[in-house]
Amino acid sequence: MRILVIGAGTMGRGIAGACALAGYETTVFDADPDAQRAVRGHIESSWARAVEKGKVTAEDADRARHRLKIAERLKQAADSDFAIEAVPEALDLKKMVFSELDDLCPPRTIFASNTSSLSITRIAHATGRRDRVVGLHFFNPVAVMPLVEVVRGRETSAETESRALDLVRSLGKEAVRVLDTPGFATSRLGVTLGLEAMRMVESGVAEAADIDRAMELGYGHRMGPLKTSDLVGLDVRLSIAETLQKELDSDRFAPPEILRTLVAEGLTGRKAGEGFYRWQGDKPAGEGKRSAELARRGRDVATELARKK
């Protein structure tokens, strides 16, 4: 089976790497020439780290390397069985990609979007094959996270959903099936918890590390909400929150000012080296300096207000 991945960012690279390791002929396309040139190096480096940790054999990594192709033009990889879109979280951009794919790909191709919050049904409307469009929401980092949400749009056929489930399982992932609603299941729950944790930091209730420890030790969460937000990407969290606030008409998804400030300053979490934490590779290395500064301001304001009461 041939798989095309559109988008060579963090998620696209992770998805392509997983597909090639699982035995699929995998092609990656990105409209940015710099991203095209860099993607193979990123993916092969991730495989090398997995080999060092004993999670992948050198032989499997070498075979995957030969299955991985990089396309300079989208039409070069159009003859695929699955086309998985992993471009930035913007509805118009995703619809444009799917419309172009619809013109280039054969009728058998199933289109999947890695969106974490946008409507699969709306995305499918950009194509003439609405029954063959499905959501495949992978989690970052793809090589580590075992979950994929399989999202069924209003017109997604049972056959398309079944084939998507089979693909997910063949990658060694666990699938959960959800209907096409704003934020699906994981983003809606995860963003709710993450935003409230950010508000607590912002208002001086507790430091980021203490909030995370409270959820990890008190509720058995593998990772606290702020560490998770840094891993997902604070820019992604902000985009999802704005989408959910609009789609569900609910202020509980209103992004806190600390989130907007960090994103505006480029401090988007692990991929930027700093967010609510400072990061060294994949591991947190202390609190983020800017988020701590913003939190101190919040505590000072809260203390002053309490004094005036």
Model features per residue range: what roles?
Residues M1-R49, K53, L104:
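NAD(P)+-binding Rossmann beta1-loop-alpha1 motif at the extreme N-terminus of oxidoreductases
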Residues I3, L21-G23, D62-F82, R163-G172, ...:
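Amphipathic alpha-helical segments at domain termini/boundaries
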Residues A22, R169-D180, E202-S203, A208-K309:
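NAD(P)-dependent Rossmann-like dehydrogenase/reductase catalytic/cofactor-binding core
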Residues V28-A61, V150-E161, A175, P182-G190:
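Rossmann-like dinucleotide-binding cores of NAD(P)H-dependent redox enzymes
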Residues A35-A38, R49-F111, L118:
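Rossmann-like NAD(P)-binding element
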Residues I110-D180, F184-R188:
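Rossmann-fold dinucleotide-binding core
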